[in-house]
């Protein structure tokens, strides 16, 4: 949701969504699909499933979320790791992936948040961990992106700058509230079967550089 809002300018207007709760051991929504429109005419189709069957990292050149190479034969590891755990043990396992866990991954690529394809008027753009694939009118190209800092470091850097330098992050608290509004709107729309108007949306506090 954050990535799509950033690409579309942040100002969502309305969202229509459906959710799925397909695991009786975890009786809550674990998947959704949504159609969201933005100020200026942009429309986004968002789909997520947390049920660990299809691994969309195969669409990201077999690179994991934190930039690590996915190992051959590792399919299903996440589900197998949870099979013998009770809810408390599962919650503790998930904390090992947080900022303060002390664990790192051997990242050789930039981090990503799943497949993103932007369909534009003169080209389609596919985001990858190493750059942007460009599918133009008559040519196809690739814009390489420099390998960035350690996974999640930019988040920590923004926090330090906010506390020590009184510098507002690009995504402020208002931005987080706007993304949270989208999450609640997805649940509301799925429950009522109706589109939901968004009223707490905002832009980032930093203009994108172009040209």
Positions of PLM-derived features:
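C-terminal helix-rich "cap/oligomerization" subdomain common to oxidoreductases
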Residues: 88-102, 106-109, 114-122, 126-129, ...
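Proline-centered turn/helix-capping motifs that create local helix->coil transitions or kinks
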Residues: 8, 12, 126-133
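Rossmann-like dinucleotide-binding domain that binds NAD(P)(H)
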Residues: 1-43, 47-111, 174
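Residue-level detector of beta-strand face positions
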Residues: 33-35, 117, 133
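Short, solvent-exposed loop/turn segments at secondary-structure junctions
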Residues: 21-23, 50-53, 123-125, 132-133, ...
